[in-house]
Amino acid sequence: MAAPRGRAAPWTTALLLLLASQVLSPGSCADEEEVPEEWVLLHVVQGQIGAGNYSYLRLNHEGKIVLRMRSLKGDADLYVSASSLHPSFDDYELQSATCGPDAVSIPAHFRRPVGIGVYGHPSHLESEFEMKVYYDGTVEQHPFGEAAYPADGADAGQKHAGAPEDASQEEESVLWTILISILKLVLEILF
């Protein structure tokens, strides 16, 4: 049996008011990203890239930099290299190749300029992207309790105590790259 109309109206009105307040509240906007207060926005880069092509950028800022990229249309992937100004999916140190938002944290010890490659995935004829470049001003804690500040050059070439962990992450990254390449190849063959 249906509820009498007179009793349902107050609940409907309350529900509509609640939904309207959620939609109109300033924190509910999907376009706004939450970032730590220590991060400083340096640049916002927007661009378009054709399927299977690269767009290259150069980063000269010192310190720890965070790149956050979202695809406005299509699917753009992010490749970063300290050794090449034209990184690709075959030649890179850092990558983010997801179907959603991409993010890469560039360590302070990377040699500048850093090459950034934005790749337009072949599954879309054209991809549009927006990349936000942040300076990460957070102070890292040293394993022995002292604060570790960004390297000033004398320390930049030395390996940190977590080198075995870095090696396992690198191996995992290579495996993911191979898996993604195989999946892309299968998708290209099927479609």
Curated annotation (Swiss-Prot):
Domain of life where this protein originates: Eukaryota
Covalent S-S links between cysteines: none
Signal sequence bounds: 1-30
Keywords: Apoptosis, Glycoprotein, Secreted, Signal
Glycosylation sites (chain numbering): N53
Intracellular or extracellular location(s): Secreted
Main location: secreted
GO biological process, one term: apoptotic process
Tissue: Mainly expressed in hepatocytes and some weak expression in germinal center cells of lymph nodes.
GO CC annotation: azurophil granule lumen; extracellular region
Xref: Pfam families: UPF0669 (PF17065)
Role this protein plays: May be involved in induction of apoptosis in CD4(+) T-cells, but not CD8(+) T-cells or hepatocytes.
Family: Belongs to the UPF0669 family.
Protein name in UniProt: UPF0669 protein C6orf120
